[in-house]
Each structure stands twice: as C-alpha cells, then as structure tokens.
C-alpha cells in the first residue's frame, strides 16, 4: 500500500492520502490528545509525543507536529501508524463511541459564535452553500476545513480546522480569499472573522 504525503501551507502540518475514503461523510478534528480518545488511529498518532493535532477529511488525514518536532524524525512514525491502520482495516473509531459519528460540517455540535437573526435565513443559506461548494473543497486541498459558526450584523464567523488551524497564512486565506469570495456573491457580508 502506498500513502502519498503532501506538504501544506502550514509548515507544521502534513497531509496524508491513503488512496481510499477516510470519512464517508463530514470530517473530524482532534485538536488535542484527549479529543482523540474515541479514535484508535488519532490516539496512536498523538502517542508519538510529537503530534499536536489530527484531522480526518474525506480522503485524507492531516497531522500537525508540535513546534519543536522535526518532521524528518516524526514522519516515519506517522507513516508506520497509518500503514498499520489501513493494511489491517482497523476501525477509525472505537466501537460504541458516540464520537465515532461523522460530523456534519454545518452542525458539529459546537456553539455558534453569535445569535442569528431569523430574518437573515436567506443570507445564511447563501453563505452555507458557498462554503460547501466553493470554500471547503479548496481548503481540503490544503489539508484543512472551514466550519460555519454564525452570521450577524454583516459579520460571518468561521472556524478553521486541520492544516488551516494555526497556519501562518490562514489569516491571508481568510481575509483575501474567503472573505473576497463570500462578499462577491453575498454583498450583505461585510466582514469575515475566525473563531
């Protein structure tokens, strides 16, 4: 089995493509080791001691290293863990864990950043459609994801996950790329903020 490795714009994160589906629907972000307890794979990656975050996308896994870690030393361990997981067809999540349920990117259970005005429902629908069809596929190419967190008074709130979380260029991506696209198609949006 061959697992492709890709660099991401975030120098601390690598994207791994196993050549098969990782998450059939939604995505999963494990920003801490304690969040990874429901996934034997994510738990094993954190157990290396040098992993700072794990993200499961549709057909990829992003692994973020701690700032002091050296990828030259960490990558063989990561590849070994990933190969072992996929060669043995191990489950992605521990049996019986509710955390194994895939997360709908528009409803992952996290709190909204603001209370939305029901009068903005059409605007919110337009925003969510753009995020789903234009933004998320582009961000996934870099090993990350964007999650809607609310819209109020002209400001759109988004959470960045995977390789996008903590990436030095994420502010530029958010402001120049995502904000520009959303404002072009939904002129009611005046500002985009990360939460």
Predicted segments, located by residue:
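Domain-level signature for proteins that mediate thiol-based redox and metal-cofactor handling
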Residues: 1-195
């Amino acid at each position: 089995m061959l697992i492709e490795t890709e660099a991401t714009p975030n120098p601390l994160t690598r994207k791994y493509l196993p050549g098969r589906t990782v998450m059939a629907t939604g995505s999963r972000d494990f920003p801490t080791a304690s969040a990874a307890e429901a996934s034997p794979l994510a738990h094993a990656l954190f157990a290396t001691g040098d992993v700072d975050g794990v993200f499961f996308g549709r057909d990829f896994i992003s692994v973020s290293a701690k700032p002091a870690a050296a990828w030259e030393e960490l990558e063989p361990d990561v590849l070994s863990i990933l190969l072992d997981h996929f060669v043995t067809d191990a489950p992605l999540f521990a049996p019986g864990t509710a955390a194994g349920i895939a997360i709908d990117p528009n409803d992952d259970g996290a709190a909204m950043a603001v209370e939305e005005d029901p009068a903005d429902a059409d605007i919110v629908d337009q925003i969510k459609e753009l995020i789903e069809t234009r933004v998320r596929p582009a961000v996934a190419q870099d090993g990350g994801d964007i999650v809607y967190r609310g819209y109020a008074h002209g400001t759109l709130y988004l959470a960045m996950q995977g390789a996008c979380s903590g990436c030095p260029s994420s502010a530029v991506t958010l402001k120049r790329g995502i904000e520009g696209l959303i404002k072009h198609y939904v002129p009611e949006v005046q500002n985009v903020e990360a939460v």
